[in-house]
C-alpha cells in the first residue's frame, strides 16, 4: 500500500510539472550546420543559460521553457551573434534567421512585441554605425571637436525623440517600451534614468504602466526604484 501511495505521489508531482504552462521557441537557422544554438534568459542580474542544441543541416530547432508570469526577455545566440525577443502569455515564438546576418536579418512571429524589439535593435545598429563613422572622421581630423560634438548630439537627440514618441510613450505598457529604455551605445545607456529629467519621465511612464499590470513583478519593482533614485538625483535643491 505504501509503495502504491509513493508511486501515485511521484506521478502526481510529475504530472503537475508537465502541466505548468510553457512557451515554445522554434524555427531554423540557415547555413549553420554544426553550430551550437543557445537559448538564454536576459535577467536583471545578467544572462542565464537555459538550453542549447547542435544545429544539423536543415538548421531547425525547438526549445520549451516555463512561461513567465509577467513579460520577460530572452535571446537566441550563435557564437557572439544574438537575437533578442520577449515572452508573456505567448505559447509559440517562431524565428527564422541566416547564420551570416543572424542578429539583423531574422524574422520573428508569435508576438508583436518581439517584432518591435527587432525594429529597435535595427535602429540601434544604425545609430552605432553612424556614431562610429563620426568617431572615425574625427580621428582622421576630418571633423573639428565642435562639429563632432554637435553632430553626435543631433544623432542622439533624433534617435531618442523617435524612440520616445513611437515606442515608449506610444505604448508604455509593452515589453518593447521596457526594452527601449535599456538600449546602449558603446556600452553606455542611451537613456539616462539617473541624471536626465526627460529620460526619467520615460522610465516613469513605463514603470507606472508595468506596476499597474504586474505590481508584484521583479522588473516592475526594479524600474520603480530606478525612477525614485533618478528623481532624488535631479531634484532642485531647496534654497
Segments (PLM) and residue ranges:
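A non-transmembrane, solvent-exposed segment enriched in polar/low-complexity residues
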Residues: 17-162
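Charged, long alpha-helical assembly modules
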Residues: 169, 176-239
Amino acid at each position: 500500500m505504501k509503495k502504491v501511495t509513493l508511486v501515485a505521489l511521484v506521478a502526481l508531482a510529475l504530472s503537475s510539472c508537465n502541466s505548468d504552462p510553457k512557451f515554445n521557441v522554434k524555427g531554423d537557422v540557415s547555413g549553420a550546420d554544426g553550430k551550437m544554438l543557445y537559448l538564454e534568459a536576459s535577467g536583471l542580474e545578467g544572462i542565464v543559460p537555459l538550453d542549447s542544441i547542435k544545429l544539423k543541416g536543415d538548421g531547425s530547432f525547438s526549445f520549451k521553457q516555463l512561461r513567465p508570469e509577467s513579460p520577460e526577455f530572452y535571446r537566441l545566440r550563435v557564437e557572439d551573434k544574438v537575437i533578442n525577443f520577449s515572452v508573456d502569455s505567448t505559447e509559440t515564438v517562431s524565428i527564422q534567421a541566416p547564420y551570416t546576418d543572424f542578429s539583423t536579418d531574422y524574422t520573428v512571429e508569435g508576438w508583436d512585441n518581439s517584432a518591435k524589439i527587432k525594429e529597435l535593435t535595427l535602429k540601434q545598429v544604425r545609430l552605432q554605425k553612424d556614431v562610429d563613422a563620426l568617431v572615425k572622421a574625427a580621428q582622421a581630423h576630418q571633423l573639428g571637436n565642435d562639429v563632432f560634438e554637435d553632430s553626435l548630439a543631433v544623432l542622439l537627440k533624433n534617435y531618442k525623440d523617435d524612440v520616445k514618441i513611437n515606442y515608449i510613450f506610444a505604448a508604455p505598457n509593452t515589453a518593447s517600451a521596457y526594452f527601449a529604455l535599456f538600449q546602449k551605445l558603446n556600452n553606455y545607456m542611451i537613456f539616462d534614468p539617473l541624471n536626465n529629467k526627460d529620460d526619467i519621465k520615460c522610465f516613469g511612464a513605463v514603470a507606472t504602466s508595468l506596476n499597474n499590470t504586474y505590481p508584484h513583478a521583479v522588473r516592475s519593482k526594479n524600474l520603480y526604484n530606478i525612477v525614485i533614485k533618478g528623481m532624488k538625483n535631479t531634484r532642485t535643491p531647496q534654497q
